[in-house]
């Protein structure tokens, strides 16, 4: 997840020292059982950090998605313990259209307290939003926004994109197109004899396992993509193979 592996230590910095505990699950998803096992490990009282929230990414870094039932199960576990549920929705539109449910069903109705609503990965420029379903969680957020340097002069010209992004369902149309292209690419790779799919294709990302010589030829021809590995794939990849991430838009 970005909050663990791609943001330097910014989350710890802006929370004045919060500790982030990364959890692993199949396909980049965590389950209620995985969260419960982690919470049971906090047994040393004041010597342990105090759990305050669980953050999930939908769609995940591997292109898999959390269903409404997946989210409800995590919420049902943590809410009695006083924890908040945050959703990293940088690819929320892709998850939503892939599942075919409503935004409400996948967020506040499933127990999400707040979410990062992504737009930059779905056609916008320098535009994301934070949505609070639990208004108590928004306390002091305006101050935190300014302290983080996010109150930039003339931001209204960037923020105006949100109106066009949401109007007429453009954000969903963009995501449907990207998801459809990902499915098409994945099907082509499945039919080939030189590559295979590493994770279920449920959004707009395809993780392909291919021979290194093929990877080198594609890069030489100008194709842009990134190598990406996951602990769960260790042992499944041969020495002459590589895992690459292909993102469609």
Predicted regions and their residues:
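PLP-dependent aminotransferase-class I/II
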Residues: 16-61, 66-73
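Active-site C-terminal subdomain of aminotransferase-like
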Residues: 50-60, 65, 98, 102-203
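Conserved PLP-anchoring active-site segment centered on the Schiff-base-forming lysine
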Residues: 1-5
